[in-house]
Amino acid sequence: MGSVTPNFTVKELACPCCGACDMDQEFMRKAQVLRDIVGFPLIPVSGYRCRKYNSSLRGAAELSQHPEGKAIDFRVRNLTGARRYLLIRTAFLLGFGGIGIGKKQFHVDGRKGSPVSWGY
């Protein structure tokens, strides 16, 4: 299937429902820069989602950026306070519009307007 960027593959980012992987190129360029700067693995858990699959997920945002190819949920091993800070700071500096952070996961998206962040 190949790579979308040096660190992220089509297989990792494809919709589990239909196999489509229509990720936005500029968004993926920024995701790769984020990975390069932080210097530790960001493992995609969810990337592109077709609208059908996205609407089937409980808790998925109505205006989710996943069907636009502008969102990724990552699993991050050993997500320490220092790593959380580095991820959040770098994502904001790179211009990601939405940033969510959980105990073991990290979300970035390409929404427009004022940046937002949340914990989950």
What are these regions (language model features)?
Residues K11-P16, R51, S56, A60, ...:
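Surface-exposed loop/turn and secondary-structure junction residues enriched for glycine/proline
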Residues M28-G59:
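Extended, low-complexity, intrinsically disordered C-terminal regulatory tails
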Residues M1-I37, K112-Y120:
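Extracytoplasmic cell-surface/polysaccharide-interacting catalytic and binding patches
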